[in-house]
Amino acid sequence: MNIHEYQAKEILRKYGVPTSTGLVVTKTEKINEAIDKLNTKVYVVKAQIHAGGRGKAGGVKVVKSKEEAKKVAHDMFGINLVTHQTGPQGQKVNHLYIESGCDILKEYYFSIVFDRSASCITFIASTEGGVDIEAVAEKMPEKIIKFAVDPATGLQDFHMRGIAYGLGFKDSQAKQMKEIVKSVYNAFIETDATQIEINPLIINSYKNLLALDAKITFDDNGLFKHPNITAMRDHDEEDPLETRAANAGLSYVKMDGNIGCMVNGAGLAMATMDIIKLYGASPANFLDVGGGADRERVKEALKIILSDKEVKGILVNIFGGIMRCDIIAEGIIAAARDIGITVPLVVRLAGTNVEKGKEILSNSNLKIIPAHDLADAANKIVEAIR
């Protein structure tokens, strides 16, 4: 789960991380009031959306008067902000965060992530802040420092020292950085986060460190322990189909292609998407119905896929282990009859009760295209939509 910048800063402040402060606005009629209340020399008006690249897209504006701030805020509120992470459709700005500006002497990058490949928590820091860390990693990898934290021992003094001195801090600033590392680590562990990113972390005119922007992502599986964090969820920032799927117990991610996929198992789902690309088309979604899906869940999965108007065909790829192929077949037929599937539908079944499943599909009198393996299925669905 993602949250907005202003919410991330609120959490970090509770753990002792110094951040820039401001006021959040959720209604246009509150804009002038917030700016008057802030009453500062420099205003920073920030669009609050769950996507990076806001600054380059015009979603962050620095102005030096109340009148300018009010105009910029009114112009920004409610627009569809398009960044390199939103896709061409953009994301509607329903929240603004208006801050007091400050002088920036130097920008840094600092984050903590759960590194799945290394099975540990990893700190990432760089003297090149305020830009995409991916660009830094590609062009100047020597500018990035990393420290892995053994989950058995947790954060140690050498981690804090290594990051502080690795970024070139000395004396009081090194002490501040070590405290920030400790605070961010504690926030990461105690909130069940998977990523906390501060970009940029700056030195201001008082020679103090300050988190100027912040992003936190949480592990959905840990949210039941944190009702206060769950309450921060902004459903307007999430794809309605993804929300609907989550409520139905389905793992669904919308993509940009036109072939809908329904698969059981994340690995098989990714392999299915790969082979669709290999045969010259693009998947419209990732959808894992899970190992224990019943007829109703299969039916709901197909309804969700067909709710995407870009879908021109559907590929169902099921390996029946825990899940029985006959149950899948019954769900497909029920969905087809209930909602009327008008796009080509290719079904590949393998595993438990596969022959029974194939028989059910064959006797349904529906226009279902059977496939005997994954390559055959991909080839048939790509040909069917051409």
Swiss-Prot record:
Protein name: Succinate--CoA ligase [ADP-forming] subunit beta
Catalytic reaction list: succinate + ATP + CoA = succinyl-CoA + ADP + phosphate; GTP + succinate + CoA = succinyl-CoA + GDP + phosphate
Cofactor comment text: Binds 1 Mg(2+) ion per subunit.
Binding residues annotated for Mg(2+), in chain numbering: 199, 213
GO cellular component: cytosol; succinate-CoA ligase complex
UniProt GO BP: succinyl-CoA metabolic process; tricarboxylic acid cycle
Residues that coordinate or bind ATP: 46, 53-55, 99, 102, 107
Subunit structure: Heterotetramer of two alpha and two beta subunits.
Coiled coil regions, renumbered to chain: none
Annotated metabolic or biological route of this protein: Carbohydrate metabolism; tricarboxylic acid cycle; succinate from succinyl-CoA (ligase route): step 1/1
Domain of life: Bacteria
Family, similarity comment: Belongs to the succinate/malate CoA ligase beta subunit family.
Protein purpose: Succinyl-CoA synthetase functions in the citric acid cycle (TCA), coupling the hydrolysis of succinyl-CoA to the synthesis of either ATP or GTP and thus represents the only step of substrate-level phosphorylation in the TCA. The beta subunit provides nucleotide specificity of the enzyme and binds the substrate succinate, while the binding sites for coenzyme A and phosphate are found in the alpha subunit.
Organism in which the protein naturally occurs: Rickettsia typhi (strain ATCC VR-144 / Wilmington)
SUPFAM superfamilies named among the record's database cross-references: Glutathione synthetase ATP-binding domain-like, Succinyl-CoA synthetase domains
UniProt-annotated binding residues for substrate: 264, 321-323
This protein's UniProt keywords: ATP-binding, Ligase, Magnesium, Metal-binding, Nucleotide-binding, Tricarboxylic acid cycle
Domain ATP-grasp: 9-244
EC primary class: ligase
EC number: 6.2.1.5
Co-factor requirement: Mg(2+)
MF GO annotations: ATP binding; magnesium ion binding; succinate-CoA ligase (ADP-forming) activity; succinate-CoA ligase (GDP-forming) activity
PROSITE patterns the UniProt entry points to: ATP_GRASP, SUCCINYL_COA_LIG_3
InterPro entries assigned: ATP-grasp, ATP-grasp_succ-CoA_synth-type, ATP_grasp_subdomain_1, Succ-CoA_synthase_bsu_CS, SUCC_ACL_C, Succ_CoA_ligase-like_bsu, Succinyl-CoA_synth-like
